[in-house]
Amino acid sequence: MPADPGPEVGSGWPGLLMSCLKGPHVILKMEAMKIVHPEKFPELPAATPCFPPAPRPTPTLAPKRAWPSDTEIIVNQACGGDMPTLEGASHTPPLPRRPRKGSSELGFPRVAPVDEVIVNQYVIRPGPTASAPSSSGPVIAGEPLECPTCGHTYNVTQRRPRVLSCLHSVCEQCLQILYESCPKYKFISCPTCHRETVLFTDYGLAALAVNTSILSRLPPEALTAPSGGQWGGESEGSCYQTFRQYCGAACTCHVRNPLSACSIM
């Protein structure tokens, strides 16, 4: 009995595999390359670039001037090499340094002497006879000893002279009336030059300094407290008594030395 030949060649997966093995062989050619490092052959010359780099131009530096002169030139201040000299040129020495200013010239506040009175950034210096008042003898010309508004002589109690911003003095009684006549604006017009003094603080008339130069020239009777009431018993010619005569529009006090023009109102 003949043997079973088995499954037919070419049928199924085994046949397909066998048919692939029996096909023509494909040979792929590959070239092998060997990389050799140049460190192993130091005798070989280094490869030169095809195009050498173009040389760069060196910039020329302008010489520095040591001082304002066209003949003296310093090429390099950091190196101590030879300096170019110009024949026939005069050497101009550098300008001397200015001395430093002292503390008084730099605007530092100075210490004011004891006999000076500073009023609203002004300085009042006493006269030559301020330290020794004389009871007898002529009075040296200066600011008058009478108030320019009421005409009464200053004293050390109710009629002390107060200095305004214009450096004119007015007695305290007249200043109080001028101050109360315009409570809204708080500035006083000088009866002498008609300039205005603004009181920026709430101290009122106490913000105005007392003119000690006038007090030092007062007679002895003005240095004592007067007898009478608050205003010294002066019933006539007093600015306090003529308070009702102040006109609201012109602000004029009709006394011995009235104000011709006042810009308070």
UniProtKB/Swiss-Prot annotation:
One of its GO terms (biological process) is protein autoubiquitination. GO terms for molecular function: ubiquitin-protein transferase activity; zinc ion binding. GO terms for cellular component: cytosol; nucleoplasm. The keyword Endoplasmic reticulum does not apply. Gene3D superfamilies: Zinc/RING finger domain, C3HC4 (zinc finger). The modification Phosphoserine is found at S103. A zinc finger (RING-type) spans 147-194. Keywords: Metal-binding, Phosphoprotein, Zinc, Zinc-finger. Transmembrane segments: none annotated. Residues 83-106 are annotated as: Disordered. This is RING finger protein 208. It comes from Mus musculus (Mouse). The gene is Rnf208.
